[in-house]
């Protein structure tokens, strides 16, 4: 990965939180749209590399409630600075669509792709997708708090083809900065970002579920989960594959993540033993 231009993706992963937080937890509990019976969450930001079909998490950051999105991105990129990775393209989801983030990415000269949030009934960004054609244009977004920023928008018509039960033509709008790509290739390219969501699902298979009130312990458990997923990717590419013309042939179905976790569990049990009995308390006489 070092000294090469890489495609990176940044995203936020929300883990539901229930109950009343202790004082040491409060800085890490954020509020978001209700999900799984709660609107309180621990939030973890990750940066993910997509290289030669390999998907690996490079950095993890526990988000504080008062942190801005620009601060979150900065902390993640600082963590991987010693890898000397040049960013070929940065993928972000619509949660990062705001004036400060776009202005900061442009100021840092970082190439990126990000969906536009469509708002308004006729004007605003709604008007961008109502022209019913594929095109490029510039757009200025205004914020009462942060001022304004002008950026390039690409609007592309795509067919749903039955995905999620939807059919027909729809138009997508993206913020694009210094991306060397044909306009019609953009939706397919951006879809690569969704591998980060699959990494979250894999991470959940490995994550230690806990009720601890210690934010550091929670971060440790999430970090271990991502490391286990990275280990699995390494094993697949190194030992569960064969070289061939056009790229390595992977046999991922022969060694799913669950199997690796079972192997690890068996190794731990052989090392420290397993509990096979319990003892009832002795009767206490008064």
Regions found by a protein language model. Name each.
Residues 1-51:
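Active-site-proximal, Lys/Arg-enriched surface segment
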Residues 4-18, 47, 87-97, 112, ...:
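Short, conserved catalytic/metal-binding motifs centered on acidic residues
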Residues 30-86, 170-172:
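Electropositive, glycine- and tryptophan-enriched low-complexity nucleic-acid-binding patches
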Residues 66-124:
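Domain-level cores of phosphate- or acyl-group-handling catalytic modules
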Residues 86, 195-200, 212, 233-240, ...:
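Intrinsically disordered or highly flexible coil/loop and linker segments, enriched in small
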Residues 108-205:
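An anionic, glycine-rich sequence signature occurring as long contiguous blocks
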Residues 130-158, 205, 228-286:
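A short, flexible helix-boundary coil/loop motif
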Residues 179-189, 204-222, 239-243:
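Short, solvent-exposed helix-loop connector elements
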């Amino acid at each position: 990965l070092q000294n090469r231009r890489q495609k990176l993706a940044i995203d936020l992963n929300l883990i539901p939180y229930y109950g009343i937080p202790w004082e040491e937890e409060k800085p890490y509990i954020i509020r978001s749209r209700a999900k799984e019976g709660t609107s309180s969450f621990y939030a973890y930001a990750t940066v993910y590399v997509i290289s030669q079909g390999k998907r690996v998490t490079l950095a993890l950051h526990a988000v504080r409630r008062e942190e801005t999105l620009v601060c979150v991105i900065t902390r993640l990129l600082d963590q991987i600075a010693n890898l000397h990775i040049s960013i070929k393209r940065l993928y972000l989801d619509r949660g990062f669509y705001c004036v400060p983030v776009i202005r900061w990415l442009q100021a840092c000269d970082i190439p990126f792709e990000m969906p536009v949030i469509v708002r308004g009934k006729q004007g605003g960004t709604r008007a961008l997708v109502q022209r019913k054609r594929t095109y490029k244009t510039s757009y200025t977004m205004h914020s009462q708090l942060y001022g304004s920023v002008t950026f390039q928008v690409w609007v592309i018509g795509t067919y749903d083809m039955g995905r999620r039960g939807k059919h027909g033509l729809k138009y997508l709008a993206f913020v694009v900065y210094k991306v060397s790509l044909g306009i019609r290739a953009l939706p397919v390219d951006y879809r690569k970002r969704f591998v980060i969501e699959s990494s979250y699902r894999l991470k959940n298979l490995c994550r230690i579920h806990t009720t601890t009130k210690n934010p550091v312990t929670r971060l440790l458990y999430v970090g271990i989960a991502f490391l286990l997923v990275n280990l699995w990717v390494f094993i697949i590419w190194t030992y569960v594959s064969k070289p061939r013309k056009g790229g390595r042939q992977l046999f991922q179905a022969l060694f799913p993540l669950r199997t690796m976790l079972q192997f690890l569990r068996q190794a731990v049990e052989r090392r420290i033993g397993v509990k096979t009995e319990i003892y009832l308390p002795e009767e206490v006489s008064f």
